[in-house]
């Protein structure tokens, strides 16, 4: 039997009613109260997520920038200390190794945050391409991550932080902030489509911080949230999930994150030729939104048809808690990607009518 990995918060899940599942080799809570309740809490008040399964890699040294420019698609030279950047790592054929966040903590000090299922693969990929005086260290086991997300997230977190959180703008961060006396890196980032913060602290401090935040946020409606709501929230906001919208066979351009690919940067990064070609002349496939008109919920890998021609497949789908509609994301032949194109999805051996719709499905009002 495979032993599942656990985050430093595992022992407190039960106290809050956490129901755990196997998620890519990790024993993580899929929900605490209910996915719907947690989803709605984040859209209307706030939710707290344990995302300590995510990986963290430190890149340091004189050649750290030159190295990162070679292995990621975005232009890291534009990043200032205190800034975060969303980017991807690609194979030479343009397929995606992973999507990630880069935090610039110092002129020669970067923190990379990578997907849990890819930690070993990413670390090996980075280490095998390291150049000059750059070092790559996997610090995943030492770092815990909590995400507090939702319109009331700032007010709740402000109760246990003396620094003015309004000063931390979107995709910016402050290092060594004290959160209820615990040193942490606090960034205004998230994976829900709402305002919020991601808090990085030492593994041994995570449980105390989790309990304190839930305590001080209770009157504002802060709820403990699991993977289920995290997935429906990111899906409504059309944020890609590695293994579904992104993979070794799907390029960032196809997945709709071309904004994180800077083919005009001088550095010759992995996948640049393919991605440049796709940026200039269009990719063969495109990630689109689909709404099911008849009964049925589109799920990952369900085929999409026009007539007898299979034009692609669903990458993610659900009954949207916010929109009360059955919607999906599908990677399809670009010829059929125009909004209002009528398609069919095969759900349990039955074709159901659907239509291509604009994305994101949900965008918060400022």
Curated annotation (Swiss-Prot):
Sections of the chain in a coiled coil: none
SUPFAM superfamilies from the UniProt entry: Aminomethyltransferase beta-barrel domain, Folate-binding domain
Gene3D superfamilies (UniProt xref): Aminomethyltransferase beta-barrel domains, Aminomethyltransferase fragment, Probable tRNA modification gtpase trme, domain 1
Keywords linked to the UniProt accession: Aminotransferase, Transferase
Lineage: Bacteria, Bacillati, Bacillota, Bacilli, Bacillales
Matches recorded under InterPro entries: GCS_T, GCS_T_bac, GCST_C, GCV_T_N, GcvT/YgfZ/DmdA, GcvT/YgfZ_C, TrmE/GcvT_dom1
Biological process according to GO: glycine decarboxylation via glycine cleavage system
Name of one Pfam family that matches: GCV_T_C
Name of the protein in question: Aminomethyltransferase
Organism listed in the record: Bacillus cereus (strain ATCC 14579 / DSM 31 / CCUG 7414 / JCM 2152 / NBRC 15305 / NCIMB 9373 / NCTC 2599 / NRRL B-3711)
Subunit details: The glycine cleavage system is composed of four proteins: P, T, L and H.
Protein task: The glycine cleavage system catalyzes the degradation of glycine.
